[in-house]
Amino acid sequence: MATTVLIPDDDGLRAVSALDGVRAVRYEPGGPVPPGGADAEILVPGFLAGSAAAALAWELPKLRLIQLLTAGAEAWVGRIPEGVLLSTARGAHGASTAEWALTGLLTVYREFTEFAVAQREHRWTQHRTDTLHGKRVLIVGAGDLAAEMRRKLAPFDTPVTVVGTRARDGVHGVDELPDLIPHADAVILTVPVTSRTVGMVDADFLARMHDGAILVNAARGPVVRTEALLAELTARRLRAVLDVTDPEPLPADHPLWDAPGLLLTPHVGGSSRGSVERAYAVAVGEIQRYLAGEPLRNLVDGEY
């Protein structure tokens, strides 16, 4: 008997329909359970799906697996029926998000934003800029994104230090973080949102960063205390590159928009050409492992 999989879009329908032993059923995110969908054993929510998708999970009595298309699972942990497995698309977006972070650092150090303004104003502002070469980089978070970030920084001869929840080969434990922060020219956040990481970048964390250092948030907005960061930016002591904010989307009248020393993008780090295909490639692999009774590679265990 075929396993029913609920799919949110046509890209997924094509990808999952190619699997043997699967009956892929298209559903409209936010809409009711489609005909034939009530027997679904696997649910694939859409990108950045919200509360409506989470509510759908409770309407599927045979549901056993929720397969996400994102690396982040904070919207789902603790909010799904007991006994239902939760798997992410870790590995699908790391390369493009690391590319975003690298671009942000280069933009700040080489002053591309300032040169773009000068171009619009027809001003020839030739001068020396800073460089990423040789900068000391601290990556907070030791997952797929951190590994991609480390690879992309290698050609710039940047000493890279990685911090994870526990110490292991090539990774420092989080207990060492307070002593490592002051030595970093740039701090890149790649952690998931958990009870331990929400607000971890607070006033004390930022105060440990040396003058002129750059904070790069490639993680999630709630990891950073916005008011604390805004205070440091307003004082022109630190700089920042943000792809995520808290709140998000950022209200049009929020003071963060006009903060000096800030490069801000609207949560597009993983949004590049081919991102959907990469996410479904990971999802299909996880679904295949589930059907074969094999361990899932991206299974969320506890808070993850």
Name each region found by the language model.
Residues 166-255:
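Rossmann-like adenosine-cofactor binding region
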